[in-house]
Amino acid sequence: IKDSDEIYLALDPDREGELIAWHLVEICREKKLIDGKKFKRIEFPAVRKEDILSAINNPREINQNLVNAAITRRFLDRFFGYKISPITKRRTIFGSSAGRVQSPALKILCEKEKEIDVFVSKEFWDVNIELTDNRKHKIECTIVSQGQKKFDKFTINNEKKAKALQEAIKKENFSLNSLNKREKKRNPYSPFSNSLLLQDASSKLGFSPKLTNSIAQELKDGVGSLGALITYHRSDSNKMKSSEIEKLRKIINSEFGSSFLPDKPVSYKERSKFVQQGHEAVTPTELERKPSDIKTELNENQYKLYDLIWKRTFASQMSPSVSLETTYYIKSENFLLKASGSIEKFSGFKKVYNYSEKDNEAQTLPELQSN
């Protein structure tokens, strides 16, 4: 620092990064190293050559509002933690601590636990019928009615009734009575913010939040000779730079064809009004770098997370999927059954990002003709 006229402060693009930059200037001031020197704050969401050069060419002053926000946040952490933790440690068996975030979260858990305690359970049974058409396609159905009696969730309220229905249904012959169809478009998901990444990595990969952030940090810092593989992973934004979107659209058109590319770039709203400005979504730093190209240089978990981020990023700018939402009403002499599901007409973004949603995913139905 003594031999430099200009000092670039390239900390993380968030409140904490701004506070660290401010502290560095203050330390230099205390050590009388500030005279005749210019301190310039730069930030870049990813370790990409164009981002770094752009940041150096467009430095700014330290944002005192962000510094104050970080100081306030730290004060609240310490105010709650230092004041309340000694009390909770004395009054609980396991020496629990308290905090600005964990205490409200604990209150929510306690309220939910109270709801569980006062809940009165009520027995009910599901009877799911699996039918097979003449082409060996399987269709899962539920009971709508038996004669004039309509079924609801609690109609079958004991095992005896369930088994009696099972035996009665086995004796019936079923045919398609009617069907309803409507076309449904499903839009792609936005690129990842940190919270969305944690949710998806948990549901689709079985990763804990701690593991996801740890692996994402490795991908951001760079693996071996690959350099940084993803952008800043603690971002609360789900937006991409326009230049990256244009690059992404060109790759999609080349790799998948024009039918998978919308006429205009897909735009997304921020999920919160408190999103820090300047952040980018969590995306690959080099969009051309396919997961398969670098699989041998990553460990298993690194590959899985990079693959998830890459697919989500590409899917975000692809065409909607199109399906026919279909309901079949299947009848016998005594029963009316219903089968709901979808018939895919165009995969769209699902060609890349087609993870099963399990309970939320409708069954894929075969085409059936009446009777």
Question: Predicted regions: what is each one?
Answer:
Residues I1-N371:
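Toprim catalytic domain recognition across nucleic-acid enzymes
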